[in-house]
Amino acid sequence: VYPNGLGNPSGWDNGIGTANPHTADDVGFLTALMDKVSRNHKIDQRRIFFCGFSAGAIMSYRMGASLGDRIAAIGIASGTVGFTLPNGQVATIPQPVRPLPVIAFHGKKDTHIYYNGGGLRANDLSVADSIRFWLNADNCDSTPQVTTLQNGNVTRDGYHKCKQGADVVLYSFANGTHEFPSLQNNDNFSATDAMWEFFVRHPMP
């Protein structure tokens, strides 16, 4: 199911983004969408997953945190869990309702949501900050199992000692930009396949 964020500017009410929370309730919208699809189709309720790119990635982070009692795992491409406000306060997605498996992908040359934080539109939290957010939520050992692929161009950090088997996995792309990793772009890596393999191993406990 492929919902799309609308508005001007287009986006999602992800709790940290551009949508107006007084006119948009996208957590409610996506919850209603799950309900409708479940009524109209035979859905395995233990295998409902969310994934997204950029603003959709941030919305998937938000849904995983808020609806973890219904969502089994999330997949993230070029997202962040929050940003630093001008007054120095940090705005993030809500604290997750349960330990949640997360797989994330991010290019180190992303010029929209910077890998190391900052960025064009706001002082986004870094990829390391976002992963740390989930390591804390999932009560994971902070030492990853590191694997390099494609002659060192892709690095996989796997955190597998987590509460309730809620693994956290990060793929970093040395030459990756603000894009969904695929076999058709510079990453030469299928995030779709990696995400699905992760989802298959992580149904709702």
Briefly describe each language-model feature range.
Residues 72-73, 78-154, 159-164:
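The feature captures the conserved acid-bearing segment of alpha/beta-hydrolase catalytic domains
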Residues 42-44, 51, 56, 66-69, ...:
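Extracellular/periplasmic catalytic domains that process cell-envelope and extracellular macromolecules
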Residues 29-32, 129, 133, 190, ...:
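Alpha-helical elements of Rossmann-like donor-binding domains used by nucleotide-donor carbohydrate transfer enzymes
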Residues 100, 135-205:
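Alpha/beta-hydrolase-fold serine-hydrolase catalytic core, especially in secreted/extracellular enzymes
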